[in-house]
Each structure stands twice: as C-alpha cells, then as structure tokens.
Amino acid sequence: MKQYLDLMRKVLAEGTPKADRTGTGTLSIFGHQMRFNLQQGFPLVTTKKCHLRSIIHELLWFLNGETNVSYLHENNVTIWDEWADDNGDLGPVYGKQWRAWGCADGRQVDQISQVMEQLRQEPDSRRIIVSAWNVGELDQMALAPCHAFFQFYVADGRLSCQLYQRSCDVFLGLPFNIASYALLVHMMAQQLDLQVGDFVWTGGDTHLYSNHMEQTALQLTREPRALPRLVLARRPASIFDYRFEDFIIEGYDPHPAIKAPVAV
C-alpha cells in the first residue's frame, strides 16, 4: 500500500489549507487516482491495524438496504453513531440508494440487483453504474454520500470497479473505503464466475484533517508489509446472502492501530 502513503505525502506537501463543514480544518488536494490490482493481494492498509469487522459489517449493512444503526450495534460496530438520530436513523443514506432508489413515478430501483443483471447479460455495457448521490434526497440524509458513484468493467474474464469519492478523509476513512469496495468486487466476481481485476479509486476533495497530522506523521514512519489475501469461505445463493463468517483474511500482519478523532 505504498501508494496510500504516497498520497499522504502529497497532501502534506501540496495541500491547500481549507475550512470545512465540521469546523476542523484540512489540508486538501483536488483529484487523485490510485489503482489496486486485486490479483496481487487484498488492499488492506498494513501501516496501521484496520478494524476489519467494521468494514465487513458496514458493507453487508449497505447491501441489506438498511439505514438504521441497529444492525451495526448488534454486531458491535459504532462507526455511524455520530450521525444517527435518537432512534438510530440516518435518513436515506447508502443502503436506501443502493437498493431502493426512488423514482418520480413512485417506482424503486434496486441498483445492486440491476448491475448484477447487467454484468450477466451485457458485460460490455458502459452503463453498469451505481450512484448514491440522489439530489432529491440529499437534504434528508444525516451525511451526504462521500463515496458517491461507482462503475463496473469486465475484460478478459476479470471484473474491475472504479469509485468516485467526492470527499475523502485520507487518514481515517480511505483505508475503510478501499477495503470495502475491494470486498464488493470479490463478492460480485464470485457470483458471476469471474476473476477479480482492478479496483480504481478516484478522489475529489482529498484531505487530511488538521487534528490528524501527528497520526499521519507516525504512520509515515512505518514500512508497508505484504498484503493479506481474501478467501471467501462459501458461495452464497446471491450477492445479498453473504455473512460475516464468509470472509477470511489470511496473512494480515499490520503495525499497531493509531487512534484519531472523527470529524463530525
């Protein structure tokens, strides 16, 4: 994951000081891309320990179409708590948009089922896209989508995915986002009898928060270690039937975790 550390260095060297919604302040660059060949290992940051339980359960929560933190709490995941209301609701965030995008005529579109069908029937289509950026519902969301738009691509029997992330917290959020979409590519490839290809990450406002500078400096002193490998323990009936126990990460040997505050 050297390219992740290189991104940190770039933000530190070239970033513009900016105010932000949270009032914390950032160093920010605009427009950056990284490519991860998923054949070469699972892109889980090794220069600090990542909380894989949270990454997996959050993705399953998205795929279930849920927007209340109750499922996450049942599985000891608290990463969305800061934005939830007193009932645990977040409004029409990722799960709602992925699984039940509302149309003007009252229909709902299950975008995940739709792209799975497209990949089976029209793998060369240039329209195999999921969007969480529903302009008509942004004001109802506890947090507007950061990872907002992703596209799939099939070539030579391999499934690739590119994500556009309009806002990226490089220290805390980005390792989660990379691992989450890499997981999704592995799951979809298994369901479609394809090999995994590349995960391409594209960032818009790509930033380090001002209260993450010491943690970033510490992480940059550490040498990356070999990437782990993801093993899927079984093949469920559909993309929606995976369980936490289905994901086995082999050979993950990270440096110790580094704590940092979340900007809310």
Curated annotation (Swiss-Prot):
DUMP binds at residues 21, 126-127, 166-169, 177, 207-209. It comes from the Bacteria. One of its GO terms (molecular function) is thymidylate synthase activity. It catalyses: dUMP + (6R)-5,10-methylene-5,6,7,8-tetrahydrofolate = 7,8-dihydrofolate + dTMP. The active site is at 146 (nucleophile). It is an enzyme of class 2 (transferase). This is Thymidylate synthase. It comes from Edwardsiella ictaluri (strain 93-146). The lineage of its organism: Bacteria, Pseudomonadati, Pseudomonadota, Gammaproteobacteria, Enterobacterales.
